[in-house]
């Protein structure tokens, strides 16, 4: 009996464990699926998916692979090249009257071959021993190009992430804006119903009721407009993620606390200093300067001599020679080995032009880096200013919303009692809507600009 009780106890524990696992699975799944079966995406999920599927990013990765192939080709150019060739020809001499004579059993036999063939065979090689370090510098240049292509891919990835953050934040704003307008519509309907009651008892004119009805209709239009904007930005996000299916698409709307919105903004200088060290566009611009230095060296190689080695082995056969093929192949072998030296004397100023243009490109690359650093500082400065300004606006708007709501609640009660007219009621309602929208706008602009500052500082969007 004791054993049976122990078994039952263990089974109950096992069932409880299974139930807990199933419940946890349902809770995890609920993050991705709404009550209607629509998957909800977090911003990080959008970014991760785009990094794997965005076509523009994939094309950028191919550029890096192409640069890698160029580098392999440049390295292979240091090695000697070899080639083999053969030429076979068939000839015919219709009026030939002499041939090869042989003696068999005391008799002389003469064989006249009017058809014959020739064969030639060769193996040759060439090696550039020195060409003013052009090959070595080409390898350096292609290495820099490969690194630059990799950084270009990172730039593309950053651009996509920034765009996702921008669209995602706009979706969050518009989603809340829809809710605000829906709340306004509920209020408008109540006012319209109250107006109808007042009309029935003779306390309101039809003209005043028409204004309330017009306000309700306008609020319905505002909802449609807000929903349309929301759908448009969701579509833009789907396109950025390369989602082409007809599945419903939605995003997770996080709950941003006031502490999150009003958190300390990192200093402008600290963000800029970190961005100079980590942003791929800065590193790529620095590589462009190094590349221009190497390009100058490559151009100057046009003034230097080049040395090359050549060698070859040739042989030939002829069916009329009277000896067998193997003997001919051996006896007709000819080998060659040569050293070539090319010294440039005058090239019509071609090399000087290339050197000067490479130096101009060198200066251009240096100016491009300075311009990029200036643009980077300006962008970060704008993000910082927007974050700080909208934080202050959010504080002011939050206070204004509370005051406007209290004022409108009072106006609504006074209107219900007949102490306020329609104009005052509608003005109060419009003021409340305006302050709520200002609060939402400053809230999400603060969040977006904070995200961008963190992204430029750490390379991650959170």
Regions found by a protein language model. Give the residues of each.
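Periplasmic alpha-helical coiled-coil/stalk elements that build and connect Gram-negative outer-membrane
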Residues: 41, 69, 159-274, 386, ...
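Sec/SRP-type N-terminal targeting helices
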Residues: 58-62, 75-76, 115, 129-157, ...
């Amino acid at each position: 009996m004791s054993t049976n009780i122990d078994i039952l106890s263990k089974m109950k524990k096992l069932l409880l464990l299974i139930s807990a696992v199933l419940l946890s699975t349902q809770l995890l799944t609920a993050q991705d699926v709404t009550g209607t079966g629509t998957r909800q995406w977090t911003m990080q999920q959008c970014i991760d998916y785009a990094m794997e599927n965005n076509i523009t990013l994939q094309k950028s990765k191919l550029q890096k692979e192409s640069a890698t192939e160029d580098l392999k080709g440049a390295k292979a150019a240091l090695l000697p090249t070899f080639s083999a060739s053969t030429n076979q020809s068939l000839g015919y001499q219709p009026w030939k009257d002499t041939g090869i004579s042989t003696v068999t059993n005391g008799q002389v036999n003469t064989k006249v071959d009017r058809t014959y063939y020739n064969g030639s065979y060769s193996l040759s090689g060439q090696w550039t021993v020195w060409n003013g370090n052009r090959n070595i510098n080409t390898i350096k240049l292609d290495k820099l190009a490969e690194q630059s292509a990799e950084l270009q891919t990172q730039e593309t990835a950053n651009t996509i992430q920034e765009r996702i953050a921008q669209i995602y934040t706009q979706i969050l704003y518009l989603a809340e804006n829809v809710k605000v307008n829906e709340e306004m519509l509920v209020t408008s309907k109540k006012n319209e119903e109250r107006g109808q009651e007042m009309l029935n008892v003779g306390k309101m004119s039809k003209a005043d009721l028409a204004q309330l009805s017009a306000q309700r209709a306008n609020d319905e239009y505002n909802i449609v407009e807000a929903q349309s904007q929301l759908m448009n930005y969701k579509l833009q996000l789907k396109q950025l993620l390369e989602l082409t299916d007809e599945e419903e698409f939605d995003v997770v709307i996080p709950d941003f606390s006031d502490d999150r919105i009003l958190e300390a903004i990192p200093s402008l200088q600290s963000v800029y200093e970190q961005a100079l060290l980590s942003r791929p566009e800065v590193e790529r611009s620095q590589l462009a300067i190094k590349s221009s230095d190497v390009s100058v060296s490559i151009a100057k190689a046009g003034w230097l001599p080049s040395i090359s080695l050549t060698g070859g082995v040739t042989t030939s056969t002829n069916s009329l020679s009277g000896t067998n093929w193997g003997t001919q192949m051996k006896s007709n072998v000819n080998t060659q080995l040569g050293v070539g030296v090319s010294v440039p004397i005058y090239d019509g100023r071609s090399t000087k032009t290339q050197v000067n243009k490479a130096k101009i490109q060198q200066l251009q690359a240096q100016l491009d880096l300075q311009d990029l650093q200036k643009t980077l500082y300006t962008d970060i400065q704008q993000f910082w200013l927007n974050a700080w300004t909208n934080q202050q606006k959010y504080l002011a708007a939050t206070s204004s919303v509370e005051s406007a709501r209290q004022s409108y609640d009072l106006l609504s009660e006074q209107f219900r009692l007949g102490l306020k007219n329609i104009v005052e009621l509608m003005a109060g309602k419009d003021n409340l809507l305006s302050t709520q929208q200002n609060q939402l706008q400053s809230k999400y602009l603060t969040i977006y600009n904070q995200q961008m500052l963190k992204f430029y500082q750490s390379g991650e969007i959170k």
